[in-house]
Curated annotation (Swiss-Prot):
Disulfide bond annotation, renumbered to this chain: none
UniProt KW keywords: Cytoplasm, Nucleus, Protein transport, Transport
Record-linked PANTHER family: NASCENT POLYPEPTIDE ASSOCIATED COMPLEX ALPHA SUBUNIT-RELATED
Coiled-coil parts of chain: none
UniProt main location, coarse: cytoplasm
UniProt function note: Component of the nascent polypeptide-associated complex (NAC), a dynamic component of the ribosomal exit tunnel, protecting the emerging polypeptides from interaction with other cytoplasmic proteins to ensure appropriate nascent protein targeting. The NAC complex also promotes mitochondrial protein import by enhancing productive ribosome interactions with the outer mitochondrial membrane and blocks the inappropriate interaction of ribosomes translating non-secretory nascent polypeptides with translocation sites in the membrane of the endoplasmic reticulum.
Annotated gene: EGD2
Low complexity bias: start-end ranges: 100-115
Organism: Eremothecium gossypii (strain ATCC 10895 / CBS 109.51 / FGSC 9923 / NRRL Y-1056) (Yeast)
Source organism, top-level taxon: Eukaryota
Region (Disordered) location: 83-129
Name of the protein in question: Nascent polypeptide-associated complex subunit alpha
């Protein structure tokens, strides 16, 4: 038997899978191209993933999926991502150097930052607005209460548009 070269697109099927594929052709199931990944979740949040599956759709709307399932463990992925983030973190010396550079920068950019404080100094009329809506806009847009009230007034108490306008 000859060896299959690496990175080739050859699929070797078991006897049962060959029979199942032949039956699918007899039942005239339609192949669904363009699907790159299928995941199945069990009750205990265990996830099975099939990369590059062969997916067929029945006339009734059900799907038949062929491929090699792998157990997808999100806790391992999360641990790996946290390790990468920790390794990418700066050491204390570089943080101190950045802080010193920021302190040595000219004080001119601080003047525009004073303008929003003046805007927040006065009280804004909150009548007609729900306190929970104001709190929600404050949390989501990370702004002061006065800015949240003004945004809600500008957008006729529409929370979504108020948050979007403040997030720009």
């Amino acid at each position: 038997m000859s060896e299959i070269p690496e990175n080739s697109k050859v699929s070797i099927y078991s006897k049962n899978e060959k029979k199942a594929r032949e039956l699918i052709q007899k039942f005239s199931m339609k192949p669904m191209p363009g699907i790159t990944r299928v995941t199945f979740r069990k009750k205990n949040n265990q996830i099975f993933a099939i990369d590059n599956p062969d997916v067929y759709k029945t006339q009734g709307g059900n799907y038949v999926v062929f491929g090699e399932p792998k157990v997808d463990d999100f806790t391992r992925r999360l641990a790996r991502a946290q390790q990468q983030a920790a390794s990418a973190a700066k050491d204390p010396q570089s943080i101190q150097a950045d802080m010193a550079a920021a302190a040595a920068a000219p004080a001119a950019p601080a003047a525009p930052a004073a303008a929003p404080e003046e805007d927040e100094a006065g009280q804004v009329d909150e009548s007609g607005l729900d306190g929970q809506d104001i709190e929600l806009v404050m949390q989501q847009a990370n702004v002061s209460r006065n800015k949240a009230v003004k945004a809600l007034r500008e957008h006729n108490s529409d929370i979504v548009n108020a948050i979007m306008s403040l997030s720009k």
